[in-house]
Amino acid sequence: MIKDKLTELYKALKEDESLSGISIKSFERPDTLGDDETSIVIIPVGPPIQTAHGSNTSLAKTFLYQINVESTNRVECKELQGRIEKIMEDQGFYQTEGGLDQWIPDIKRYVDARTYKGRSALYEEY
């Protein structure tokens, strides 16, 4: 059976007590969420990429995800991203260059968006 890394990351974030009570979704922030409510959004930057080849076969996959935190409180964005970073490290993901760290006047929220790269174990089907 094929595995789904997005679901695995979502579950890891949802299971963390320090993130309880915060809306965590994939792909986009829910329209029904209040403008003043904090959210975390997991966005695949692309499909899994073949890596670690052997005998004309891909033995592992590389993944790239962007995780956005939006809040009316800049410090809360930083604290949440700090916790997310630890969770992602536990999942074998590390932050890459780029991202976003700014106040967006149109939505009246701070946004801290970071990109994480990780790899599956050998012989896992994703």
Set out the residue ranges of the language-model regions.
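Oligomerization/assembly interface segments of phage tail-like spikes and tubes
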Residues: 59-72, 109-121
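Small/polar-rich, solvent-exposed N-terminal microdomains that initiate assembly or binding
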Residues: 1-52
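Charged low-complexity stretches with an acidic bias
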Residues: 69-83
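Amphipathic alpha-helical segments
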Residues: 6-17, 81-93
